[in-house]
Amino acid sequence: MSNEVKKNEELIEKLVSVKRHSKTVKGGRIMSFAALTVVGDGKGRIGVGRGKSREVPAAIQKAMENAKKNMVSVNLNNDTLWYPVMSNHGASKVFMQPASAGTGIIAGGAMRSVFEAVGVHNVLAKTYGSTNPANVVRATIAGLAKIKSPDEIAEKRGLSVEEIQG
């Protein structure tokens, strides 16, 4: 469970977790490995991927390729969020709120990898319920994906940004 950081084609690749699986057959146990990775460009694009193979490096490679195929765009306010947001996936619930410059990433485990890959540098975050890395990563990305900028909200409501921000 290391956090490997690699810059490849301007993408930040993070390994979130590696788990060992076993299948019991007549002749014994067959081991395989499952990897969970996060890929981002540091500018608001993020993807999550899973890969499974008999060897760890092959599982990680498959997960990285899968993450690159499943990238989504996130709306950020420079290096933080626009407003507090709560999201869940399965039994995992995550709460994220913007932080002032210099605060850093105050988040645990799998959430930290997502924030580093997407390009968020100042955020306060907390996980409630299950801390299963797969569910926490998906909940974090879902929460980030539903954030809208004041410009988008104003356009949707047919108002000016000043009227919305009061």
From Swiss-Prot:
Q: Which InterPro entries match?
A: Ribosomal_Su5_D2-typ_SF, Ribosomal_uS5, Ribosomal_uS5_bac-type, Ribosomal_uS5_C, Ribosomal_uS5_N, Ribosomal_uS5_N_CS, Ribsml_uS5_D2-typ_fold_subgr
Q: Which keywords belong to this entry? A: Ribonucleoprotein, Ribosomal protein, RNA-binding, rRNA-binding
Q: Where is the S5 DRBM domain?
A: 11-74
Say if the entry is tagged with keyword Nucleus: no
Query: Which GO MF term does the entry hold, naming one?
Result: structural constituent of ribosome
Which HAMAP family does this entry report, sorted A to Z? Answer: Ribosomal_uS5_B
Q: What is this protein called?
A: Small ribosomal subunit protein uS5
Give the organism the record lists. Answer: Francisella tularensis subsp. tularensis (strain SCHU S4 / Schu 4)
Question: What gene name is listed for this protein?
Answer: rpsE
